[in-house]
A protein has these predicted regions:
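N-terminal membrane topogenic signal
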Residues: 1-13
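Membrane-embedded alpha-helical segments in integral membrane proteins
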Residues: 14-27, 71-78
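Membrane-interface helix termini and inter-helical loops of multi-pass transporters
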Residues: 25-31, 193
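Single transmembrane alpha-helix segments in multi-pass membrane proteins
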Residues: 33-89, 93-115, 119
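Hydrophobic/aromatic residues within the transmembrane alpha-helices of Major Facilitator Superfamily
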Residues: 42-43, 50, 124, 128, ...
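Transmembrane alpha-helical core residues of multi-pass small-molecule transporters
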Residues: 95, 121-125, 211
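Transmembrane helix-bundle core of multi-pass membrane transporters
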Residues: 126-219
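Membrane-helix/interface signature in polytopic inner-membrane proteins
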Residues: 214-233
Length: 233
């Protein structure tokens, strides 16, 4: 029942956006690129939200999420520029976890106020990565400490049949893309948005979005999740 209600709201939203596109002529409003960019930019927010969800459910107020993500982003950029994107992703996870570990030890083991610890991590992380950037890039290996290093892109793919992509040498049809190119009111707008959300999506984005239902299952459908939520209560 709740799922159907959400679907109705989603369809109504697409209809409103399609109407605005026709009235204003803003073709990018429902374009594939706009939907794809929105999905890509939502990944850091989703990951931070999931981190905050687990922290809150365990009884820890985690204001230091920003600092942890800053640390992970720096490590991912530096290691990724040296050893490739997958090594950079692993380094980002490890370096970000260090910040989480510091917060956990400070609040749980030493009883430091959660807000104070979180704010401290945010401040320290910002200064730490600035110092590390100056230290690592001072010899001209990169234009400067304020410039992001170049990293190879992680491969992308699409939903078979619906959004194109390539699977084991087989080139999948792009049904949604074909419908989007027909320029039918609402139908093509809906297809264009769905094409942006399911086509040319990075594997990391796929995993990040998959973490949402997985986190729900862990927290509300497993014994571990029950114990975690009980500890937070």
């Amino acid at each position: 029942m709740k799922t159907m209600k959400l679907l109705r709201y989603a369809v109504m939203l697409v209809f409103v956006l399609a109407s605005i596109r026709v009235i204003t002529g803003a073709s990018d409003l429902t374009s594939t690129g706009t939907a794809s960019a929105a999905l890509l930019l939502s990944v850091p927010i989703v990951l931070a939200a999931l981190g905050g969800l687990f922290s809150e459910r365990s009884g820890v107020v985690n204001i230091g999420l920003e600092g942890m993500m800053i640390m992970g982003a720096w490590a991912g950029g530096y290691i990724g520029s040296q050893h490739g994107p997958w090594a950079g992703l692993l380094a980002a996870m490890i370096f970000g976890s260090v910040g989480a570990l510091v917060h956990a030890i400070a609040t749980v083991s030493f009883g430091v106020d959660h807000v104070v610890s979180g704010v401290a991590i945010n401040i320290i992380a910002a200064g730490l990565v600035r110092y590390l950037s100056t230290l690592m890039y001072k010899n001209g290996a990169w234009p400067g400490p304020s410039q992001s290093p170049g990293i190879e892109t992680i491969p992308v793919n699409g939903l078979p049949v619906l959004s194109g992509g390539s699977y084991f040498g087989w080139k999948s049809p792009d049904l949604l893309g074909s419908i989007a190119n027909l320029n039918w009111f609402f139908i093509s707008d809906l297809a264009s948005i769905l094409r942006g959300l399911t086509g040319d999506v990075s594997y990391v984005t796929m995993v990040a979005i998959a973490f949402v239902p997985i986190s729900y299952f862990i927290l509300w459908r497993t014994a571990f999740g029950l114990r975690l939520r009980s500890a937070g209560e």
